[in-house]
Swiss-Prot record:
Name of this chain's protein: Putative signal peptide peptidase SppA
UniProt KW keywords: Cell membrane, Hydrolase, Membrane, Protease, Serine protease, Transmembrane, Transmembrane helix
Taxonomy, superkingdom: Bacteria
Assigned protein family: Belongs to the peptidase S49 family.
Gene Ontology BP term (one): proteolysis
Gene giving rise to this polypeptide: sppA
EC number(s) on file: 3.4.21.-
Annotated transmembrane regions: 6-26
Gene Ontology terms: cellular component: plasma membrane
Enzyme class per UniProt: hydrolase
Alphabetized PANTHER family for the sequence: PEPTIDASE S49, SIGNAL PEPTIDE PEPTIDASE SPPA-RELATED
Gene Ontology molecular function: serine-type peptidase activity
Membrane topology qualifier: Single-pass membrane protein
Organism of origin: Enterococcus faecium (Streptococcus faecium)
Active site, UniProt feature: S150 (nucleophile), K202 (proton donor/acceptor)
Length: 344
């Protein structure tokens, strides 16, 4: 019998034992006992999902540099990090930022960014927590990898120092709301929109009618309000005049060298260069370098672990995940403003 089948037998035995235990419990206590027992079994199979520290470089215990990573679209899919297949998990990342704020041994942060951006709300949440870290006099050095555009730049603008490679794609400072309008197609098919509304603008950006001039004006003002907030974040973080930022913030992208020339990036370099600079400039050469990990057995990534998690409702199905991502990116009935590079 191969390893996979032995695991399956073990799971089956565990579930059988659970059902026997629960069956012996009377009435109203049964559901509570079932949940408690199931939680215990899940911890054995999957792990506790608690955030733990993994040491990358040994050093002084009272001096820590925390390495953080934003890798992927900045969107809150609502999934637990334990069962998430997305590269970036928003709630888990926010928890890491708060953990830094609570740890007095943390003396520096190295942030790696490889993201085209994402939701304006999620980006603002990250920027808010990063600002709290800076208020604690904890320096933040950021290293851009392949892409750090739009929301990826937004969350980094307040860093003490930003590094990028010559090949990095950054910039794309701006806001986008995207949607489809198929009113012309409906007209050709002889389909009539029958929407009843309390006000003329109640169904703004509906794909079923052509937008009016007033509607276009209102939506554009909404977009520009978010744009102004983005510009202010960059101006404050980079110590630049808002008009100077606006000249750069027409949505265009920059490579690393262009970003340095325009004051959006401080220095050409990789993650290790940013870390070396942080250590030397902030007198942290003897610091311990750590990153946060979630306690997991790895069972959640297996076929069997996936299926059991879906059966318990702990993990979204593949179709649910696809729908969730599309909704977060605005591919739903309600278009959303995004700090996002690459269109929608």
């Amino acid at each position: 019998m191969n390893k996979r089948r032995w695991i399956a037998v073990g799971v089956a035995c565990g579930l059988l034992l659970l059902s026997i235990i629960v069956a012996l419990i009377p009435g109203k206590d049964k559901e509570e006992a079932s949940n408690t027992t199931l939680t215990g079994i899940n911890k054995i199979f999957y792990g506790s999902n608690e955030i733990t520290e993994e040491t990358l470089e040994e050093g002084a215990s009272n001096k820590k540099i925390v390495k953080l990573s934003v890798n992927g679209v900045i969107a809150d899919t609502g999934e637990s990090n334990l069962f998430s297949r997305e590269q970036y998990n928003h709630q888990n990342f926010l928890t890491q930022l708060k953990k830094i704020q609570e740890d007095k041994a943390v003396k520096g942060v190295l942030l790696e960014v490889n993201s085209p951006g994402g939701g304006i709300y999620e980006s603002a949440e990250i920027a808010k927590e990063m600002a709290k870290i800076k208020k604690l006099d904890i320096p933040i050095y950021t290293a851009f990898k392949n892409t750090a555009a739009s929301g990826g730049y937004y969350i980094s603008a307040g860093s003490d120092k930003i590094f990028a490679t010559e090949e990095t794609t950054t910039g794309s400072i701006g806001v986008i709301i995207s949607g489809l309008n198929y009113s012309g197609l409906l007209e050709k098919l002889g389909v009539t929109d029958a929407t009843y509304k309390s006000g003329a603008l109640k169904d703004m950006m509906s794909p079923q009618h052509k937008p009016s001039e007033e509607e276009n004006k209102v939506i554009q003002e909404f977009v520009m309000s978010a744009y102004d907030r983005f510009v202010n974040v960059v101006a404050k973080g980079r110590n630049m005049d808002t008009n100077a930022v606006k000249e750069l913030a027409d949505g265009r992208i920059y490579d690393g060298n262009q970003a340095v020339e325009n004051g959006l990036v401080d220095q050409i370099g990789y993650s290790e260069d940013a870390l070396d600079s942080l250590k030397k400039e902030k007198k942290l050469t003897d610091a311990t370098v750590i990153e946060y990990k979630n306690d997991t057995t790895g069972f959640a990534s297996s076929w069997l672990g996936n299926k059991i998690a879906e059966w318990q409702g702990l993990k979204a199905t593949t179709s649910d995940r696809v729908i969730s991502v599309f909704e977060k990116l605005g591919f739903s009935d309600t278009p959303k403003p995004m700090y996002y590079y690459g269109g929608l």
